[in-house]
């Protein structure tokens, strides 16, 4: 046996291995003693002890955790726990770059829109620069949907997230404006990437995806109001799509015209109506700080947006206007004909908007993912939501949207857990239908555990499955960290039976109050078996149950 090597004789790789082993030893000891541990502190100290300038990667630490400690330690090591705090791993994918569909009849794209084949960022999709994290992943995979999915799922796994349930977001301009052949190829590959099967068409891909171990619980597609007509909605139902993100940007007709949107505000209201009657969840993209609006008019449009039954979306993505090189807005800004709000005024505005959000709406995002160096004017802070919430605290207002109150997010940010849970019901009218928002909440601490969106379809419903007295469940979601579909973790809120209880109440309301003979559910492809257990059967793209 040779002498043990001195620290100075060891290679960098050997030192890194010793550092990782030491970090894990400290984590195991802390776990055995029931102590909380600051991982960053441990990594910094241990790296310094072994004379390393760089810290070990989280992926390598997770990979080295001994099998019998994985269950206890990996959740504590998870990078970006918010990624799966809502119970689902979100995988964003991008379709190939293509021109905006309304160029052909308005002659140009929207004044604020970067990206696209004709822009300074020519390898990027419309409305993206190619430097956002999702864009960069898509470009690396040459916009191949299969590779984008496999790489992202693998990445989330390595970071310690459960990828048992996946929701896709299809980004990159107006997907529904692309040729049908390409759309089918794209969606087919998303499903195949999860199931491992090679399908010949979308129907076959969906059939195999239903039985896959990694469940596709939903697909979200970004679209425009003029590409959200009956034929588009029917195609999207066939894909397994459950949520739409519709670019609204402004509720003012003059602003839509001046910014060259290429559609009217009336088209927005009609698309909301058609989409909700088909069972989709509707998320609106809105842009405060557009040209010729001003602060007061901006606040008024959001009051209108949440209170007027012609709008009332289920979700909101708030994208304050950014000035980016190569856009029409950049030229206006350069010549002094457009000026962005000051950073402080923008935080004020976002705080006022968040205070208006009703408890049934979820605010998904508060700013774009565009890297700051590409922004000539507009948002100057990367943490706009946090700043706005802090400003609301000062103003004595609070944000009561779905995301702020979710049990998983509350646990990460405030370490609070629900104590007394009760069923809460809120009814409202939106887009020609009667909406009921059912939720399990802890009203004392204002924490949301699960929600269900029930709608009595309007007589104008165009889907044959939903005609003649049918109610539809547009969303059922129990929040809390992802629990693999087959396991029950008593400390996590998914799989505790809240979903079943919400469905029972929805069936009662549909039968006794709506007078409906059937209840339909727009279900993600991978969750259809969950509804089969409750007596639902597949009818077209919906899971349906007779109530009498």
Swiss-Prot record:
The terms describing its cellular component in GO are:
cytoplasm; elongator holoenzyme complex; nucleus
Q: Where does [4Fe-4S] cluster bind?
A: 100, 110, 113
What is the cofactor note? Binds 1 [4Fe-4S] cluster. The cluster is coordinated with 3 cysteines and an exchangeable S-adenosyl-L-methionine.
Q: What class of enzyme is it?
A: transferase
BP GO annotations: axonogenesis; regulation of transcription by RNA polymerase II; somite development; tRNA wobble base 5-methoxycarbonylmethyl-2-thiouridinylation; tRNA wobble uridine modification
Query: EC?
Result: 2.3.1.311
Q: Does the keyword Acyltransferase apply?
A: yes
Q: Do you know which CDD domains this protein is assigned to?
A: Radical_SAM
A GO MF label = phosphorylase kinase regulator activity
Which cofactors does the annotated protein need, by name? [4Fe-4S] cluster
What are the N-acetyltransferase domain coordinates in residue numbering? Answer: 397-548
Q: State the similarity comment.
A: Belongs to the ELP3 family.
Query: Assembly and partners?
Result: Component of the elongator complex.
Kindly provide the name given to this protein in its UniProt entry: Elongator complex protein 3
Q: Which gene encodes it?
A: elp3
